[in-house]
Amino acid sequence: MSFLLLTPPPCLLIPPPPLSHRRSSSLFLKHPFQPSPRPLSFCKPSALRLRANTTVNSLKALETIKPYLQSESKTVLLGWLCSCVSVVSLSQIVPRLGSFTSNLNANAASLTKLKGECLVLAGLVLAKVVAYYLQQAFLWEAALNTVYKIRVFAYRRVLERELEFFEGGNGISSGDIAYRITAEASEVADTIYALLNTVVPSAIQISVMTAHMIVASPALTLVSAMVIPSVALLIAYLGDRLRKISRKAQIASAQLSTYLNEVLPAILFVKANNAEISESVRFQRFARADLDERFKKKKMKSLIPQIVQVMYLGSLSIFCVGAVILAGSSLSSSAIVSFVASLAFLIDPVQDLGKAYNELKQGEPAIERLFDLTSLESKVIERPEAIQLEKVAGEVELCDISFKYDENMLPVLDGLNLHIKAGETVALVGPSGGGKTTLIKLLLRLYEPSSGSIIIDKIDIKDIKLESLRKHVGLVSQDTTLFSGTIADNIGYRDLTTGIDMKRVELAAKTANADEFIRNLPEGYNTGVGPRGSSLSGGQKQRLAIARALYQKSSILILDEATSALDSLSELLVREALERVMQDHTVIVIAHRLETVMMAQRVFLVERGKLKELNRSSLLSTHKDSLTSAGLVI
């Protein structure tokens, strides 16, 4: 019980949702086309998972679960209490079976007593059935609530990671993360339930049934005990094999999930390139690898319980010995019946222990991979003394900023200095890969600069709370991100869980030139946008993105190629919205379109990590041709 008395992590304060659990099943079908399941170069296991310690043993796996199970101790105790009731009922059934058989040939005077025994037996059986049902219900509740807390905490830690974790080659793909938090978390729930429902209840039942067997015949009990050690050693060996096979199976499933998460969102690109057949072949490679590894796991999982069946062979020898003892001793037939019944009820919990060990070894890799997510630490760390900004004027200073994505790479930014006054609009132009977007990521503190500092209103951004910094710096990118939901949900995204202010939503939409088209939609602001905003045009999505940035009342706005992919009319509407926004915001514009660049008061060229100011008036004459030929403006 001591393992339940640990301090829970902060995530455990989150109330659990209504319970639901559904076991997944596997269907193994042969397919006439079975290509070699060679791993593809872009989808190596090393790119899909953390470099976790593969020698995690069972005790360590259990240790990681303890804090999350602590708040479920009351539910677990109720389940184990029901288990005690079930075992006590069963222990009362065993001796009554012996007396019941001895009374079968009794005279008529004993029939009344026999009827009474039948009623008692029926009552005990009913009590056992009800208690066992409640035991399972309570323990499933504890297991599912525990995994819910682990899921919430793991996902929170993923969201807290810096951008490098998702963009670098050593992180985890989104498909792998989704697989861990869904499918593998369900396997962890199965493992926790198997342990809770087996270890203590089976130990109680084994103890009670063994006591009955000893009372009936110590000699027969000794013969029974001789079977157990050899079987236990074999189960331990096979369990270790199962853990290794299970890990390979989970990696194969994660690869398949990652592949689907990459290809399905790009279905337009696939069809445009007539790649349906090639993608089908690639899918079959991953699916075949997943099938093969799962099949190995299922075969090993099926083998271990069968080993426990060897104990039944041992019981045959016990019956033979029992017959000899009965023939040459005073052991009654009722005692033999009690012993055999106790042995039958003993074999089930011993077999359940084997199955629980089976579940533990199968679940260990899932526990390890899920808890890899909870152990993630962000490289962008908020200082304890960081302050909350109530109001921001919008002055931005970049002081000797240098940055490179990897120690072995050349600097993307090299000693860059820039001072932007509050309310000023600055445009950044330059070739792709020159460092423009990197500069924006540093301003949002998605990365830490290699050297130098970024100052907002005379305060180093490292001294500002991350939530406060990103509240006052709004981003509108070329690739607009919209989530399934209504237009109001997407504009008021920041307040989605706390309550959206519809007046602010409508005001932001009007400023962003979006109110008119929104009101022409069937349900206005309550119109669904579809997956990733699929029901809206590019211009409409871009205006919603501007409205979203305005809704959060950001003093500093970053426009990263906000008009590059729009048609002329949409671009005109977006530019009109931007002109209104620029009147009372500090705006940093990254653009290639000359019309958008000329909206800025100052223009800078970012090239090879350096910053050079361009004469704004000469952009229309002297520098225009050279910038256009270099592809810096269009």
UniProtKB/Swiss-Prot annotation:
Transit peptide feature, positions: 1-51
Residues that bind ATP: 430-437
GO-annotated cellular components: chloroplast; chloroplast envelope; chloroplast membrane; plasma membrane
Entry keyword Methyltransferase: no
GO molecular function, one term: ATP hydrolysis activity
Chain ranges of the ABC transmembrane type-1 domain: 77-362
Bilayer-crossing regions: 75-95, 119-139, 195-215, 219-239, 307-327, 330-350
Subcellular location: Plastid, Chloroplast membrane
Tagged with keyword Transmembrane helix: yes
The entry's keywords: ATP-binding, Chloroplast, Membrane, Nucleotide-binding, Plastid, Transit peptide, Transmembrane, Transmembrane helix, Transport
Record domain ABC transporter: where: 396-633
Membrane topology of the entry: Multi-pass membrane protein
Family assignment from sequence similarity: Belongs to the ABC transporter superfamily. ABCB family. Multidrug resistance exporter (TC 3.A.1.201) subfamily.
Protein name as catalogued: ABC transporter B family member 29, chloroplastic
Source organism of this protein record: Arabidopsis thaliana
